[in-house]
A protein has these predicted regions:
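Active-site-adjacent pocket-lining segments in enzyme domains
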Residues: 2-8, 13-14, 20, 27-45, ...
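Short gly/ser/thr-rich secondary-structure transition/capping motifs
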Residues: 52-60
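Lipid deacylating catalytic domains
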Residues: 48
C-alpha cells in the first residue's frame, strides 16, 4: 500500500520548490520504477491557494482534516511563513515529530521551523544563518548546528535554502527510501547537469 506524503502550502508558496519532489514521488524516481508514495496537498482551508508564480492549487486537506496515516510532511517555502495562518502548522509539525514522521522544509519554511525551536536538536540549513537568527530570536539555540549547504538531512528533518530544491529533493528521496541510493544519485546528476555537461 502506498504511503501519503503531504505538501503543506500557504498562499504565495514557491511553486518550483516542491515540483521535483512531488513528481519523483508521484510517478517514480525514474520512469517505470516502483511508486511507493501518493502526493497530497494541505492548506489552511479547503479554499485554493495561489503560488508566487500564479498557479492555483485546490488542496486535498485543510489543516483541520489532515489524516494521521502519512509518511512525511513537506513544508514548501514562500512569502507567508511569518503570517498568522502559518502558526497553525506548528502543532502539525510537533505531532509529526513526536510520531517519528519525516519533516521536509525548504526556504522560509526552514526559517519557520527555526522560529519554533524545531531545529535546536538537528543539523540544518536554510536561507542563511543571519535569516535563521532573525526569525528564530531567542527560540533558536543551535547556531552551531547550521551548515552552509544547499540541503541538510539529520534525524527525520530535511532543510534547504530556496534554491536548493534539487538537493532538497535528493535528501527527501533518500530519507523516504523512494528508490536505491544509486538510482537517486543518478536522478540528481541528470537534473543537475542535464543531457550535456
Amino acid at each position: 500500500m502506498k504511503q501519503k506524503v503531504i505538501f503543506v502550502l500557504l498562499n504565495d508558496y514557491s511553486d518550483w520548490e516542491g515540483a521535483f519532489l512531488s513528481t519523483a514521488l508521484h510517478v517514480g524516481v525514474v520512469p517505470g520504477s516502483d511508486v511507493k508514495y501518493e502526493v497530497y496537498t494541505a492548506a489552511p482551508t479547503l479554499n485554493e491557494v495561489r503560488s508566487i508564480g500564479g498557479l492555483r492549487t485546490l488542496p486535498d486537506y485543510s489543516f483541520e482534516n489532515i489524516p494521521r496515516d502519512y509518511a512525511a510532511l513537506v513544508l514548501i517555502g514562500g512569502n507567508s511563513w511569518d503570517s498568522p495562518e502559518a502558526e497553525f502548522v506548528s502543532p502539525l509539525v510537533q505531532e509529526a515529530l513526536s510520531k517519528g514522521k519525516i519533516i521536509g522544509a525548504i526556504c522560509n519554511a526552514s526559517s519557520f521551523l527555526c522560529s519554533h525551536g524545531f531545529l535546536n536538536e538537528v543539523k540544518h540549513t536554510g536561507n542563511g544563518l543571519d535569516q535563521l537568527k532573525q526569525w528564530g530570536g531567542e527560540s533558536y539555540t543551535n547556531e552551531a548546528g547550521f551548515i552552509e549547504k544547499q540541503a541538510v538531512s539529520d534525524k527525520n528533518i530535511v532543510t534547504a535554502n530556496g534554491v536548493g530544491y534539487l538537493e532538497f529533493t535528493r535528501e527527501m528521496l533518500l530519507l523516504l527510501q523512494a528508490n536505491s541510493p544509486e538510482v537517486i544519485a543518478g536522478w540528481y546528476d541528470f537534473f543537475k547537469n542535464g543531457y550535456f555537461k
